[in-house]
UniProtKB/Swiss-Prot annotation:
NCBIfam families: infA (TIGR00008)
Disulfide topology: none
Compartments in which it is found: Cytoplasm
Keywords associated with the record: Cytoplasm, Initiation factor, Protein biosynthesis, RNA-binding, rRNA-binding
GO-annotated cellular components: cytosol
Domain S1-like: 1-72
Coiled-coil stretches: none
Primary location recorded for the protein, binned into one broad class: cytoplasm
Name of the coding gene: infA
InterPro entries associated with the record: NA-bd_OB-fold (IPR012340), RNA-binding_domain_S1_IF1 (IPR006196), S1_domain (IPR003029), TIF_IF1 (IPR004368)
Pfam families in the record: eIF-1a
Quaternary context: Component of the 30S ribosomal translation pre-initiation complex which assembles on the 30S ribosome in the order IF-2 and IF-3, IF-1 and N-formylmethionyl-tRNA(fMet); mRNA recruitment can occur at any time during PIC assembly.
Biological role stated in the UniProt entry: One of the essential components for the initiation of protein synthesis. Stabilizes the binding of IF-2 and IF-3 on the 30S subunit to which N-formylmethionyl-tRNA(fMet) subsequently binds. Helps modulate mRNA selection, yielding the 30S pre-initiation complex (PIC). Upon addition of the 50S ribosomal subunit IF-1, IF-2 and IF-3 are released leaving the mature 70S translation initiation complex.
Protein's UniProt name: Translation initiation factor IF-1
Organism: Pseudoalteromonas atlantica (strain T6c / ATCC BAA-1087)
Length: 72
């Protein structure tokens, strides 16, 4: 799947789950389960509850996503 097909949304981390998974509430009110992207994992970017993040989702499954950016 091409990168252009992904949907990017802003959200807030609600909860930390096992295996570097997070529960994220998006701007539109939906709650998704998201994991950290590989570059964030490689650079040891820490994500805590309450952080503002950018989440990338595929149009095929809107309940799962990938965290690609953490706002400062």
């Amino acid at each position: 799947m091409a990168k252009e097909d992904c949907i990017e949304m802003e959200g807030t981390v609600l909860d930390t789950l096992p295996n570097t998974m997070f529960r994220v509430e998006l701007e539109n009110g939906h709650v998704v389960t998201a994991h950290i992207s590989g570059k964030m994992r490689k650079n040891y970017i820490r994500i805590l509850t309450g952080d503002k993040v950018t989440c990338e989702m595929t149009p095929y499954d809107l309940s799962k996503g990938r965290i690609i950016y953490r706002a400062r």
